[in-house]
């Protein structure tokens, strides 16, 4: 999906609007978002599951705090989604 930052004034708001559209179009689905930058903060905060990837380039501190789960690289995020037991272990009470 193309992020139209000119339409919304910023990429951060554009990503949030895309998320809102996805939720509206898919009311019975859970929306998962993965990101690490300042422009991902609102996206991760408002997704049903927000995963922040720190990676070699690091991550925006507010984005880390806005996410549900923090991982060290994208492969770890994908492994969580592919392995139900890992996701359960991470999110258990």
Curated annotation (Swiss-Prot):
Taxonomic source organism: Methanocaldococcus jannaschii (strain ATCC 43067 / DSM 2661 / JAL-1 / JCM 10045 / NBRC 100440)
InterPro entries: HAD-like_sf, HAD_sf
Name of the featured protein: Uncharacterized protein MJ0073
């Amino acid at each position: 999906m193309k992020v139209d930052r000119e339409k919304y004034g910023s990429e951060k708001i554009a990503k949030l609007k895309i998320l809102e559209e996805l939720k509206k179009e898919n009311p019975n689905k859970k929306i998962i978002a993965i990101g690490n930058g300042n422009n991902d903060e609102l996206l991760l905060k408002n997704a049903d599951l927000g995963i922040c990837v720190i990676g070699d380039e690091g991550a925006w501190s507010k984005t880390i705090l806005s996410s549900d789960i923090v991982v060290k690289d994208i492969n770890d995020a994908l492994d969580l989604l592919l392995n139900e037991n890992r996701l359960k272990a991470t999110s258990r009470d």
